[in-house]
Amino acid sequence: IVVPRTMEDLDLQKVAGTWHSMAMAASDISLLDSETAPLRVYIQELRPTPQDNLEIVLRKWEDGRCAEQKVLAEKTEVPAEFKINYVEENQIFLLDTDYDNYLFFCEMNADAPQQSLMCQCLARTLEVDNEVMEKFNRALKTLPVHMQLLNPTQAEEQCLI
């Protein structure tokens, strides 16, 4: 899967702080379709490190409860692209952000034969912004694989501690 890169530059310090997972999409919906699906994660916070890596604080359902995890995304030569070791070795890349309201990112597992892509729309607040959601949908259409959308914004589905 080759994904078009839309962000040339990334100011890592500006993505720091609280975020909320507003929508998720995946090339294989089984990665997201249940509470315990492997990539059904709720981003809480992004923390740039002094080495320009990115610590991702997320929540995920485990053993019937919501558990917090931290994942380190290691910088690569490409400004908006990181390597992570979550579930398997994957790449994370930022598709688009305005830093203040929204951030779109995708996680790609490039290991054949199970190549898969999962993307999320993050927002600084829990208010749904239809313009941002439309922009996320347009961004998904630029991807080389068909993405199935899931909106986990209903409170009972959000993994809250």
Curated annotation (Swiss-Prot):
GO terms for cellular component: extracellular region. Disulfide bonds join 66-159, 106-119. Coiled coil: none annotated. InterPro entries: Blactoglobulin, Calycin, Lipocalin, Lipocalin_CS, Lipocln_cytosolic_FA-bd_dom. Its main location: secreted. It comes from the Eukaryota. Keywords: Disulfide bond, Milk protein, Retinol-binding, Secreted, Transport. Primary component of whey, it binds retinol and is probably involved in the transport of that molecule. Monomer. This is Beta-lactoglobulin-1. It comes from Canis lupus familiaris (Dog).
